[in-house]
């Protein structure tokens, strides 16, 4: 299956959104259709989602007005109601109770063969969205560049900017998740990629955001041999997770620190997150300093243990909508060379495709 790309160099936020919406019209229709079915599974009808979309757009406009304008442009270009696209950008908040199975490994330069920090993650999500995501390269008129792997119609997710700030993303669950909608985590990720010029700026932006859906956002940069830190955001407030003494940080889908840990629901909903964390930590501990390469880290994630304990997920034929978890993509972030590499599928079936701006133009 082809890796979908889109390149943007429009001068205005609205034009950027309109052009993307028109170019990705069919893919956006696919994505909004799947989420419509997922909303319905959670008891939300079209009127409920529209109301939540309006609420989300107001929150986005207050936090990042330029991204609110971009979302309005995406809606216009794709022929979708603006509240539908706003709700799509807040789908984590609307479906806050849904499970997810993403695994992240990040290493400081002391552990890698290149001597530079490295971030790797699997993105596990609904199989029905296998053709609903893309790699989006954005060149702003002031020279800033952002590359993000995201679902069509959503302004950002996992990514890298030209200043060497990389973001990885894992869903979490907290008992206080829920309405009213806070800053949508996908909008937060894009804002960080747009704005941050280093690890401190990224961490400050993430920690300051008032969210209503919990996530672990891992920041990886190449500053002074690498900076790696996960911010666990939740309605209870932020917490920070740093690498262990060997220079490795592993995160899955449960809180590791307070204040979020006291209200964690991820372990109850998917206890396999504990096993994934343990397996990844043990496999990384078996590697010596200076030995970690992208290939070695990817190989460590090719685990197919059952249920939510698998780091490389494949759906079963009889799995129902909402339960067909699949590793849709595997991502390698190398901040030292400003490169985000996206592999379609899981670690056991990767097909590489560089997401450099030059590749995105092709």
Regions found by a protein language model. Name each.
Residues 188-194:
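Short, well-ordered beta-strand elements within core beta-sheets of diverse protein domains
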Residues 90-179, 183, 187-188, 328-331, ...:
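Internal mixed beta-strand/loop scaffold within catalytic domains of large alpha/beta enzymes
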Residues 1-101, 194-228, 235-236, 243-362:
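C-terminus-biased signal that marks the final domain/tail of proteins
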């Amino acid at each position: 299956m082809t890796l979908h790309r889109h390149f943007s160099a429009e001068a205005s936020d609205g034009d950027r959104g309109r052009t993307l919406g028109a170019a990705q019209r069919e893919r956006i229709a696919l994505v909004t259709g799947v989420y419509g079915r997922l909303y319905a599974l959670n008891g939300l009808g079209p009127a409920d989602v529209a109301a939540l979309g309006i609420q989300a757009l107001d929150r986005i406009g207050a936090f990042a007005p330029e991204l609110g304008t971009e979302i309005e442009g995406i809606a216009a270009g794709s022929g979708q109601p603006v509240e539908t696209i706003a709700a799509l950008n807040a789908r984590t908040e609307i479906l806050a109770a849904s499970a997810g199975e993403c695994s992240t490994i990040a290493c400081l330069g002391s552990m890698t063969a290149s001597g530079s920090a490295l971030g790797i993650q699997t993105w596990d999500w609904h199989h029905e969205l296998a053709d609903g995501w893309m790699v989006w390269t954005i060149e702003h008129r002031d020279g800033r560049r952002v590359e993000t792997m995201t679902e069509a119609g959503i302004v950002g997710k996992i990514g890298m900017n030209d200043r060497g700030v990389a973001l990885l993303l894992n869903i979490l669950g907290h008992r206080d998740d829920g309405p009213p909608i806070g800053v949508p985590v996908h909008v937060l990720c894009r804002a960080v990629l747009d704005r941050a010029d280093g690890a401190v700026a990224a961490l400050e932006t993430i920690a300051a955001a008032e969210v209503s859906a919990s996530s672990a956002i891992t920041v990886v940069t190449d500053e002074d041999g690498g900076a790696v830190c996960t911010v666990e955001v939740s309605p209870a407030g932020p917490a920070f997770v740093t690498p262990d003494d060997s220079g490795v940080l592993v995160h899955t889908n449960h809180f590791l620190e307070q204040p979020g840990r006291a209200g964690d629901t991820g372990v109850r909903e998917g206890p396999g997150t504990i096993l994934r964390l343990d397996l990844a930590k043990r496999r990384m501990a078996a590697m010596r300093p200076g030995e970690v390469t992208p290939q070695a880290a990817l190989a460590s994630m090719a685990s197919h243990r059952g249920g939510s304990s698998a780091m490389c997920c494949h759906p079963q034929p009889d799995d129902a909508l909402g339960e067909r978890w699949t590793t849709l993509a595997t991502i390698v972030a190398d901040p030292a060379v400003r490169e985000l590499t996206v592999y379609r599928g899981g670690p056991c079936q990767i097909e590489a495709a560089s997401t450099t701006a030059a590749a995105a133009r092709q």
